[in-house]
């Protein structure tokens, strides 16, 4: 494990003593009083996000919803029991037509008559239970796969949050080092300005030369403010991704850690897993459509009491009579206007498209892995090169300052050397950013990025 601490070289060379102390002080005081700010490791930030990030909470709720939907479909196999009751009072009893021939009258003639009593009470308990229903079995299979999809979607969101927080954390570290670089350059510029002012007092340089150094110092101060503002914005974004209040004062570890030449074992990416689960879902839906042509069988039973009442004295009464039955109901779909056939054709085309999408995701993933590996290798080499460039630029700057004191170097030479040093420092930081991003991307594409890694 390589570390970029308060050194900017793989070798044992360090900043000059003043610059080194200033760098340490700046890292410690960057967010104010260090006693008021907790130092968070990258893993702590990720663990906090896993608990408080709202997107992850939403996806966890979606997983719970899919679990409840599966239980809901399974509950359709459980017997259903219902109770019904009603009371009816007839102001006018219902009429019936009686054939007169039943009483010796002529054929084809009827006589109206009223039957029944005014008070009618019915109470029934009914039971129904599916014995064989292909639609229910298909729905159970489909909701199980839908639950798997929601779990994969949660994993995908988890990886995205991991990726986002890691990038933000690295950006905060990089911005901290940029501020330290600017502070170091401010120290060098302040020294140069002091020397130039002394030389001006001795009439060895002009006021214009002093103004150039003063301008460079002001430019560095402006750059310092811009970086500090960017740092605050990135910190707020990091807090948002972690799900903690913006008012909470945090600081990240100053050390930038990265591992070189690590080979990741390739696992199916979360996107590939998601497309595969969607393919299984479509296949399950297709099978459900085909099975909808099969008959369904259910058991039914009922028990009840029917009451009849008459309330006129002296013949008033209220009597109840039982009624019950049990049976089997069979439902067979015969013809629905080719609707099912058209739905099956549509689902077959959807499966074909999803299979093509799965192949596309696999090919795209292989391409992105190859590109990420190349990018990581290039940035790894760039880090080594820029480290040497920083050491060389420091030597050139220090030698130029000495030559300027001896009168053999001009102010322009010093400014050029200083700019070269700053450029080397910025190139070094950019190389680290590119390496860490390429490494994160490679971990994501190979299925190695997660909260557990």
Q: What are the roles of these predicted feature ranges?
A:
Residues 84-125, 258, 301-332, 453:
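Small/polar, glycine/serine/threonine/aspartate-rich low-complexity segments that form flexible
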Residues 37-92, 204, 246-283, 294, ...:
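Bacterial Sec-pathway N-terminal export signals of envelope proteins
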Residues 68, 152-154, 158-268, 375, ...:
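Periplasmic alpha-helical coiled-coil/stalk elements that build and connect Gram-negative outer-membrane
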Residues 21-33:
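Bacterial N-terminal signal peptides
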Residues 57-61, 74-75, 131-158, 208, ...:
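Sec/SRP-type N-terminal targeting helices
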Residues 200-204, 404-408, 445:
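A short glycine-centered flexible hinge/capping loop motif at secondary-structure junctions
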Residues 1-18:
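N-terminal secretory signal peptides that target proteins for export/translocation
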Residues 82, 91, 427-453:
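Acidic, low-complexity, intrinsically disordered peripheral segments
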